[in-house]
Amino acid sequence: GFDFHFLFTYQKPTYKKYETSVTFSSGYVGKINATGNIVAEIPEVLIELDPSYMITPALKVWTSFRYFSKTYANINQAYYFNGHWETFGGVNWQANKRLSLGCTVVNFLNQTGAKGSIAGAELITKDEAKDIKNQLMTGSYLRPFTVEFTASLKF
């Protein structure tokens, strides 16, 4: 039969009394005052839509759609990522009591972009970020379109 899982999360965790500074050997002083800022890497809205259908008692098809709203990439809120969808889908087949097979398609909508945090951006302020253009940055990215096959054998 048909099954549908839905989850809506609204959250707004903020930093409390988060002030510090660090002086580097070059003399540069990096200051952070993140008090009241939304916690980095946490979306304010998270939505999960997970329909599945058992075609037969041994064959299941499923999809998963997850929405993440705007997410800050550093604690100073100088960088952020726009909201995005992450998608998965697949087929699971219980061939017999010992063997199960599966196929999962990751990112079937072929979404592209970054997520999470940006390496080395912890101390960058909004004012400093305005002057940073055309520079290579590293971080985490959405998983690319991928097809995965699985097999599980139970003894």
Go through each PLM region and give its residues.
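Gram-negative outer-membrane beta-barrel transporters
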Residues: 1-71
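Transmembrane beta-barrel strand/turn architecture of Gram-negative outer membrane proteins
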Residues: 7, 88-92
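Short acidic, gly/pro-rich beta-turn/loop elements at beta-sheet edges
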Residues: 16-18, 61, 73-75, 99-101, ...
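Residues that define the transmembrane beta-barrel architecture of outer-membrane proteins
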Residues: 41-47, 83-87, 143-147
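Active-site lining segments that contact anionic ligands and/or coordinate catalytic metals
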Residues: 58-60, 84-88, 98-100, 146
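C-terminal beta-signal and adjacent terminal beta-strands/loops
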Residues: 69-71, 93-155
